[in-house]
Amino acid sequence: MTQYWLGLDCGGSWLKAGLYDREGREAGVQRLPLCALSPQPGWAERDMAELWQCCMAVIRALLTHSGVSGEQIVGIGISAQGKGLFLLDKNDKPLGNAILSSDRRAMEIVRRWQEDGIPEKLYPLTRQTLWTGHPVSLLRWLKEHEPERYAQIGCVMMTHDYLRWCLTGVKGCEESNISESNLYNMSLGEYDPCLTDWLGIAEINHALPPVVGSAEICGEITAQTAALTGLKAGTPVVGGLFDVVSTALCAGIEDEFTLNAVMGTWAVTSGITRGLRDGEAHPYVYGRYVNDGEFIVHEASPTSSGNLEWFTAQWGEISFDEINQAVASLPKAGGDLFFLPFLYGSNAGLEMTSGFYGMQAIHTRAHLLQAIYEGVVFSHMTHLNRMRERFTDVHTLRVTGGPAHSDVWMQMLADVSGLRIELPQVEETGCFGAALAARVGTGVYHNFSEAQRDLRHPVRTLLPDMTAHQLYQKKYQRYQHLIAALQGFHARIKEHTL
């Protein structure tokens, strides 16, 4: 009987399930859309019961369409978005809707913390910046605005922790994710009560479940879950992965010469290093990586291809091929139309919002689409340039995410950055990485390093056009000037409203 490992991937828009054999060959993938709720401007929530129903449905669909039985599945892992907040009450029931990482309701709290110097106080211990989607920001918001709900908190989790609990009935917070929550002391490798004390949320210390490893077997499929999904009761479930870690793992990032760029709702640039550094040029975000003694370092903001998805939804459905043809039909770096990809947040200050600048009657939809492509790449450059100050010997950027399927967009990224672009040929990095964690956890591999060596994916390479690089550098500089001017505008508005 052929054995398989199941990988679940819960993102911002889709819940996916993939099956892989011992050699990593895909036996099937199923996807179901996820609904995000926005009961008020700037809020982003998810119905927790509905998410579990969707999870069960995608597992059932995968088993049905693949012809694989639950008896053949010998391990399960989950990859998911980081941050946000999934709460259980003291009776182990979902406590309201989950709050997603793109939620901005805690902006005033974060602004207040910034004025009080809290981020600078936290960073040496947590190696995290502090923003609206962090669990700690959302917990403080609940304490101030929904105190009755806050008082009922029995367990604090994030996305894949919640789904793992649904599957197994066992609570835990997976380390690659919880290490980036501002609840975790990076040097100590554990929760630190002084953090919640500084943040004014010490009441939730009792609600923090045990920290579990990515490949650690945390529980088994319950009889109830088995009856609802077709899985076999007793199948082991491992801790899983923060999706950024899963992507870096699948991209084969293992030294300081190559970085990984993830292009999705979030613009993320990641690198792998051994040890923490003090006195760096920027407050780089660190997280625990899957190998002992290693850390993932990244820069990120919600400023990537989600902006294109919003545009096409609002202004008429158009296929990805048609978009690429439209963008390719225009001269590279031509014109003075700019797009600021800040629909869901920015990397240029809390007040910054999205928009086109320089639009005239001569511009067509193709020009707007080109400006979106450029704006997303320019925003990625903000993070890439900062990361290259730390990873000084980088010569290659490995790119994953939806835009990696667009040669037009990837060539633009190569031309703007001047870097060699490599595209790992793996379709579902979240599912594959989660299943890989399950293979490590069930003993197929001794560790993730051994698994990476055994499962190298082919890559496709694009090289920069250095003539276009010079043109894009000039336009990127103008983009930076526009950002600076708008930052000045917001600063003056703030002065007049005080």
UniProtKB/Swiss-Prot annotation:
Xref: Pfam families: FGGY_C, FGGY_N
Q: How does activity depend on pH?
A: Optimum pH is 8.4 with L-xylulose as substrate.
Q: Does the keyword Coiled coil apply?
A: no
State the source organism's domain of life: Bacteria
Say yes or no: keyword Cytoplasm present: no
Q: Which keywords has UniProt assigned to this entry? A: ATP-binding, Carbohydrate metabolism, Kinase, Nucleotide-binding, Transferase
Point out the coiled-coil segments of this chain.
none
User: Which GO terms fall under molecular function for this chain's record?
Assistant: ATP binding; L-xylulokinase activity; phosphotransferase activity, alcohol group as acceptor; protein homodimerization activity
Q: Which reaction does it catalyse?
A: L-xylulose + ATP = L-xylulose 5-phosphate + ADP + H(+); 3-dehydro-L-gulonate + ATP = 3-dehydro-L-gulonate 6-phosphate + ADP + H(+)
Q: What class of enzyme is it?
A: transferase
In terms of Gene3D superfamilies, this protein maps to: 3.30.420.40
Q: What is its EC number?
A: 2.7.1.-, 2.7.1.53
SUPFAM superfamilies registered for this protein in UniProt = Actin-like ATPase domain
Task: Enumerate the transmembrane spans.
Answer: none
* Gene Ontology BP terms: L-lyxose metabolic process
- Known partners and oligomeric status: Homodimer.
UniProt function note: Catalyzes the phosphorylation of L-xylulose and 3-keto-L-gulonate. Is involved in L-lyxose utilization via xylulose, and may also be involved in the utilization of 2,3-diketo-L-gulonate.
Q: Which family does it belong to?
A: Belongs to the FGGY kinase family.
Query: Under what name is this protein listed?
Result: L-xylulose/3-keto-L-gulonate kinase
Gene behind this chain? Answer: lyx
